[in-house]
Amino acid sequence: MNIRSNPDTTRPAVTTGGLPSSRKIYAVPATAPDLRVPLREIMLSEGAGEPNLPVYDTSGPYTDPGVTIDVNKGLSRARTEWVKQRGGVEQYEGRDIKPEDNGNVGAAHAAKSFTAHHQPLRGVGDAPITQYEFARKGIITKEMIYVAERENLGRKQQLERAEAALADGESFGAAVPAFITPEFVRDEIARGRAIIPANINHGELEPMIIGRNFLTKINANIGNSAVTSSVEEEVDKMVWAIRWGADTVMDLSTGRNIHTTREWILRNSPVPIGTVPIYQALEKCDGDPVKLTWELYKDTLIEQAEQGVDYFTIHAGVRLQYIHLTADRVTGIVSRGGSIMAKWCLAHHQESFLYTHFDEICDLMRKYDVSFSLGDGLRPGSIADANDRAQFAELETLGELTKIAWAKGCQVMIEGPGHVPLHKIKINMDKQLKECGEAPFYTLGPLTTDIAPGYDHITSGIGAAMIGWFGCAMLCYVTPKEHLGLPDRNDVKTGVITYKIAAHAADLGKGHPAAQLRDDALSRARFDFRWQDQFNLGLDPDTAKAFHDETLPKEAHKVAHFCSMCGPKFCSMKITQDVRDYAAGLGDNEKAALNLAGAGSFGSVGMTMSGVIEDGMAQMSEKFRDMGEKLYLDAEKVKESNKALS
């Protein structure tokens, strides 16, 4: 059911209601009975003969019929109490919103401000604030308990096949356990191998974890530009993206009303929100990178941290000494953030202020538990530039910065390319693990060829599946509009579904113990011709049903034992089922003919094995003719015929 609810006609309309034959359920962790961890239960048809299937759910309360959605008020801020109960924080007035925060937009173009105002929190003193600091001190937070329950997909105990699934996969050194415990989560965060991006000011958040020993996650990018989109569209795209499976969303807005757009998104987002602060900082100085200053950038970090942004992409690895390494590239510097900082460095002939002030950035981000997403500003923008010295020089610097951020108590993940051909992908993963101490890797694709504008969701989905299998923790989606324009909601859905496929394929390859449950359930539904179950178990039930109904639209076709590709006579699965039914109704002599093993004579009837087989085949040939030479027969008629033969 897709209901476009709009409590205020001047505010965003968002999609609510569950996916077909699904319902929102909540798991309750044994160690924290006050927590309710969301899952989506896919309800199978009565004839399925198997239980309903719980799956990971990112859609938040938008698919819970028991929750009234009002985007003007935002979502419940239940997590704020968790933060306050831990202590070590203070509530304060926060900075004033300035005209430049929204690009000095005039009254005629100003978006309506979000209704509610929440005073921000910040850490004080030496008490642990970040999930990394709690983990290092051996403290299991509610967020850690929450994500452990979430990662197990509703399983209360180890699957019977868990060890076999792990053994069957190739994890390339990952250590995926058969069952996720809160202690395992804490240990992975303490080692720096996983993060829970969770700003203390994002009270609406449903915590999730990013790390190669957990389910592979995906990110969806949204955001306005100077020429298109609005607050309404971006809030709608955020809700639409998480409906289809986006684990995090990045707001990459570069036009008017940046602060206001972000506030509406955050107050209505149950998933982590990331940004690239340099984009907004650039808008504050009229789009001229030369005018950027550390003070302006720092103020932007504080502004966004107070709002609740969960992770910042910071291109601190773009150093003055690396810029010349891009001179011989085919496509130069393709990262917006990277090119901004490169121009600043060259204009001032100084080291990047992001690099020289990195310690101070860490101190600021720690106060709010904003996670680092250390940006790859020198990523390759073409196959020809993949794995060059510029790319890897920056990666080595990101490894150095990771250690500094950890020492300051911050959570860190590393961004990666880009455009990389298949044979060069694993080198990227191996080098990132080595240089960055196994901090989670977060890549854009990578795109595996440059020849398919309009289809780069496919060129990148191929690379994403591979690098996810090799150990990449989160995959940033690419839409069909990549390199061509700003994606609309249809492009967002296509990008999300494409990357859910890639992430799931990676989990299957790694041998994640619960990954294959959904595949097997759908395969059984396919073999049993349970069409509705096939649709509903898929990542996109609406499209699957629409494709089926283009040629077989009647309700009777939803129970037919064929589809339009092969028709009723040539469906391999229907033929296989008929063979099974036929075998079940064979008489003893017929079974002997078809199942004899070994050579020699069949003493009880005085015939050789070949004679028995020939006789059996002759009987079946005659029987086929007697029953009208029909390929498909009623099972009861076959059984009656068999009784006459036996």
From Swiss-Prot:
Catalytic activity: 5-amino-1-(5-phospho-beta-D-ribosyl)imidazole + S-adenosyl-L-methionine = 4-amino-2-methyl-5-(phosphooxymethyl)pyrimidine + CO + 5'-deoxyadenosine + formate + L-methionine + 3 H(+)
Compositionally biased residues, Polar residues: 1-13
Region of interest: Disordered: 1-21
Domain of life: Bacteria
Segment forming the signal sequence: none
EC numbers, comma separated: 4.1.99.17
GO terms of biological process kind: thiamine biosynthetic process; thiamine diphosphate biosynthetic process
Coiled-coil residue windows: none
Protein's pathway: Cofactor biosynthesis; thiamine diphosphate biosynthesis
Cofactor, free-text remark: Binds 1 [4Fe-4S] cluster per subunit. The cluster is coordinated with 3 cysteines and an exchangeable S-adenosyl-L-methionine.
Positions of Zn(2+) binding: 419, 483
Cofactor: [4Fe-4S] cluster
Keywords for this protein: 4Fe-4S, Iron, Iron-sulfur, Lyase, Metal-binding, S-adenosyl-L-methionine, Thiamine biosynthesis, Zinc
UniProt: [4Fe-4S] cluster binding residues: 563, 566, 571
GO molecular function, one term: carbon-carbon lyase activity
GO cellular component assignments: cytosol
Residues annotated for substrate binding in this entry: 221, 250, 279, 315, 335-337, 376-379, 415, 442
Subunit structure comment from the entry: Homodimer.
Function: Catalyzes the synthesis of the hydroxymethylpyrimidine phosphate (HMP-P) moiety of thiamine from aminoimidazole ribotide (AIR) in a radical S-adenosyl-L-methionine (SAM)-dependent reaction.
Family note: Belongs to the ThiC family.
Name of the molecule in the record: Phosphomethylpyrimidine synthase
Record organism: Rhodopseudomonas palustris (strain HaA2)
